[in-house]
């Protein structure tokens, strides 16, 4: 077949048409000369009169190679497109189906190695990694979401995930409202609750590590389906709003360097980056989050060192500062004890938002390779995040930034230098370092946006699998991505394009209003689920030895956290009806800015009760299903593993024993 006939779609093998010119040869890229050279050796003896035939055959062969290469490259595109097809075995449960106690069925995802499958064929009832599993349970295991998250990712999540808008930017307004003393007290109260919450969350996450959606599914079968439905949807809405909130914050952060470029330009760049990262699934999210968290932790450590030097007069232009700003203008804002107490209470919502995503280790349990080892380790390290990343760094900020500074959000100034961490350094004459801090703050904000995109899509997908959201959102593709739910998360991200609006700070405030208080509801349900689980275990005569990890603060820690969260909701209601500033007069805007999540939760709760006609307040302890969805650990095997581990520590170096005690 000649080149000319090939181009015209004809296949005349016997054609004598040899009309070729150099332009035809120029169409062939010289990158295929490796294919031409062997051909020259084979037909090197061709007579000169057959030169045209030689060139034609060579060109034909080269074009065939080019077509093959094109098909080869096209195969990547086809595989990428095919990866979005529904995974085999991925399907939603019927919304109409229910189990014996009337709760909505939960779809679980399990996976087992080839060794586990081989063991299943040889034994009728086996123990894998300390977990008892029957052959039927093994056969039902489906590889929907992929186990791409490693222990190093989980540990770094416990230390760095959530260090973003709440801590690095949102506290600017809180410092202005409460003063440094009120800020620290509010965060200390919330931090003590968070530690108890994470311990409860860690225990349940190990037990129910195969539940898609993590902790938002616990109350469905441990407490009350209506509570689970309302809080899960509120949690989903929270993180759908957090993604555009973080992108708006990123555009505000960029204003530190320039105000001449339209903020929407940067929103487009960051928006595309977040979507692309999540297209790579859990692995892309985990690796990006690991990098972001490393940068954030290094920035916090660097800030510690620099802030201490500035405060002691070793850098900057103000000499020794010490606790000057705690005396003038003071540690608390307000002239009366009531006003000062109100300032402390006002920190709770922002503190809850700042501590948000601490429970992310449970959300990712179904995509972790070894949750029984990684989750307890991460939960124990949470105390260091609370003490150093939050309390210590905010104390240093309070030493360096007076709450009357006009650069803080909520003061007379603008958001150009919104972060109190940047203000703490730049306001004392340090020139270069603030640029590095602001760059890491930008990475931190993008990290939380990345986590929000990941979390919201997984929550929406789990709601669909439970029958509590449209069935189309249960779609999991061949790469383990909840593709339909990710599309919804991407659409919500478009809200961020309001960054160029003059109402940018108002949008920031309203998105924060939805997100902050929602976190309290989520934490309350986690602790209630833990309390009800322990109660059901006791009533049904089950041993806690079946639990792979037990909360270090026990059920009393969960009870303390619930009590404090309820008091925080009550106190926040008081702040909403008598806001700080404006003479303490009630207005609809100030009320909903502080308490928007409450009416949303009430509406969702009532909607479920009417929809399902289920008027019970909770599932009785003796009716709680403690078999389905749960990893039942072999108590004797776990004891043996613990003894072997302790023996290795006793025989090992001293530093390992110290590290094990603290970590």
Swiss-Prot record:
Q: Does the keyword Transmembrane apply?
A: yes
Q: Which domain of life is it from?
A: Eukaryota
- Record cross-link Glycyl lysine isopeptide (Lys-Gly) (interchain with G-Cter in ubiquitin), residues: 34, 39, 41, 61, 132
Tell me the membrane topology, using the record's own terms: Multi-pass membrane protein
Which GO cellular component does the record give, naming just one?
cell periphery
Locate the compositionally biased regions of type Polar residues.
Answer: 12-22, 91-117
Q: Looking at the keywords, is Ribonucleoprotein present? A: no
- Give one Pfam family: AA_permease
Which molecular-function annotations from GO does this UniProt entry contain? amino acid transmembrane transporter activity; L-proline transmembrane transporter activity
One of the GO BP terms on file: transmembrane transport
- On the Cytoplasmic side, which residues? 1-154, 199-219, 286-289, 364-381, 454-481, 528-560, 612-663
Q: Cross-referenced InterPro entries, in alphabetical order?
A: AA-permease/SLC12A_dom, Amino_acid_permease_CS, Amino_acid_permease_fungi, APC_YAT
- Report the locations given in the UniProt record: Mitochondrion membrane
- Give residue spans on the Mitochondrial intermembrane membrane side: 176-177, 241-264, 311-342, 403-432, 503-506, 582-590
Query: What sections of the protein cross the membrane?
Result: 155-175, 178-198, 220-240, 265-285, 290-310, 343-363, 382-402, 433-453, 482-502, 507-527, 561-581, 591-611
Give UniProt keywords alphabetically: Amino-acid transport, Isopeptide bond, Membrane, Mitochondrion, Phosphoprotein, Transmembrane, Transmembrane helix, Transport, Ubl conjugation
Residue span of region Disordered: 1-24, 87-117
- In-chain residues carrying the UniProt-annotated modification Phosphothreonine: 127
The record's family statement is: Belongs to the amino acid-polyamine-organocation (APC) superfamily. YAT (TC 2.A.3.10) family.
**Other remarks in the entry:** Present with 10600 molecules/cell in log phase SD medium.
Task performed by this protein: High affinity transport of glutamine. Also transports Leu, Ser, Thr, Cys, Met and Asn.
The name this protein goes by in its record: High-affinity glutamine permease
Record the organism: Saccharomyces cerevisiae (strain ATCC 204508 / S288c) (Baker's yeast)
